[in-house]
Every structure is written in C-alpha cells, then in structure tokens.
C-alpha cells in the first residue's frame, strides 16, 4: 500500500480500538459521568439536598461550639473575644467537611464532632490573626468589625491563642468508647501540621507583597502560600474526619488530595470575588489584596483564566472521590460545586 493508504488504515484501526474500549467500559464511564460531572443544580439526581444538609450540619456544630466556650470569670473578656469570632455567622464549611468525611468512611457524626469543633476553632484563630494591623490589616469580617477593632489587639491575640489551646483540649479531653487512642493522636498530629502550614503560608504571603513574578514562579509561589494557608485547614478537616471514622490509609489520602484541590479552588474563587464583588456583598473589605500589592490568581492570570482554573480544580477534586459509595459521597461532590459557584 502507498504511504497515504497505510496512514488511513492505521487511523481507522486506532479509532475502532478506541470505540471498542469505550463501549466495553461504557457502564463505568456513565457512573463516573453521573457522579462527577453534574452541576450543583442537578444534585436532586442524587435525591440529595446539599443546602439542607449544610444547614443541619451547621446547626449541630454551632450548638457544640456554644457549649464549648461558656462565658465565665476570671477570663470573661478573653472568652467574649473568642466567642465573637468563633460564633459569628459562618458557613461552617470546614467542620461540615470533617463530619462528611467521617460519615463517608463509615463513622457517625457524633464520633467526629469534637474534631469538627476543633478545626473551626483553629479557623477562627487564624481569622483573628489575619485581620491584625501587622498582618492583613482588615477592619471587616463576616459583615462585622474585626476582633481587634472591638476588643483591642492584645485581647484579640490572646483570644486567638486560647482558641488554639481549646482546639487541642477539645480533641483530646473527650473520651470515645469506640475510638482507639491512636486515632485521637493522629488527629492531633494533623492539627499541628495544619497550624504549621498556616504559619508558613502567612509568612510567604506577607513576604510576597509588592514583589513581581513571572507566570511560572508566580503560580509556584501562590500554590505554596495557599496549599499551606487556605488548603491546610480544609485538608486537616477531611483527614481528621476520616481518621475518626476509621477510614483506611488509602481513603484518608484520597480525601486529603480532594481537600487540597477544593482548598486551592476556594482561594482562586476568593481572589476572583475580591476584585468582582463589593464589600457589602462579601461581608469583608473588597479589593484589599490589590491595594496591598499581593499576588493573586486574577493578578497573575486574569479573571477569566482564574475561573477556568477553578473549574479544572473542581474536576480534579471529583476524580479523587471515585470509588467511594455514590450516596455517601454526594455531600463532598456537592461541596466542591458549592465552593466553585459561591458568590461571597
């Protein structure tokens, strides 16, 4: 045969082989497509209502947080400051993720509630520190004056440190008849790792202010910041929940990878909202990263490319959920969609 005929023959053969493979694995393909590529609006296909799930989990977490930080003397002022940030209106994404991960691997909500509260305490602590004048210098958080504006910098710092201590205490002081001590130890190790990540990410964030980066080094710098800063607590939330629920090492690592993806995605979306929404819409000061000269995803790649990157991270996050029970994984699939589509 002539070269052209040989080429056509090879192309047709490859096409037929791919067609055979597609039809052979079509049932699995359909499972993956139905589980991982639906938008949030089609979550009803799971017979699963994500917003109701999220609200119910938030109510359970809020009740536990309220009980964990009672007002008492002599540290009344510190506890008022702790409660001010900890109990302020929030979506409770991190504790919800912790509880969902626990349930995904076969555990019960009650088993992971202490860990869920602990992760929210760490989150509240990080918000107080982030807003300080020596850090991000912000005066608005969740639609209210930031902690140091209300209580002063010294009380805010003490409240932040007290929340970290309380997070550890919350995880270790509770006794679980059905949870081996080594699981408790592992959750504490994950918490410590998350705090280390927050510190490293914040330091890199501050160091990068006003610096110029090309596209490659800029993306590398951003990924380092937000894997350690934004993604750290989401990663810890998922892993701690999976550990408490008795997940296997493989399940834990897959959930870690999933959470890292949605953590980065959360930050990409946050950066986009910072330049496209008002302070009233966000409940915090809009455009402050631009004013501070911080490196952000829109600054590095533009708003539209940033949105595309968030969508790619959403797909990647979903891929890490393959193999889990289709019904139990619905909250995490929907959470990824919720994060990529959020407006504040």
Swiss-Prot record:
- The enzyme's E.C. designation: 2.5.1.-, 2.5.1.1, 2.5.1.29, 2.5.1.10
Under NCBIfam families, the record lists: FPPsyn
SUPFAM superfamilies registered for this protein in UniProt: Terpenoid synthases
In its UniProt entry, what is this protein called?
Geranylgeranyl pyrophosphate synthase 10, mitochondrial
The annotated subunit structure for this chain is: Monomer.
Q: Tell me where in or outside the cell this protein is found.
A: Mitochondrion
Record field: transmembrane: none
| Matches recorded under Gene3D superfamilies | Farnesyl Diphosphate Synthase
Which GO MF term does the entry hold, naming one? metal ion binding
Entry binding sites for Mg(2+) 1: 130, 136
Question: Where does this protein hold Mg(2+) 2?
Answer: 130, 136
Q: Which residues bind isopentenyl diphosphate?
A: 91, 94, 123, 142
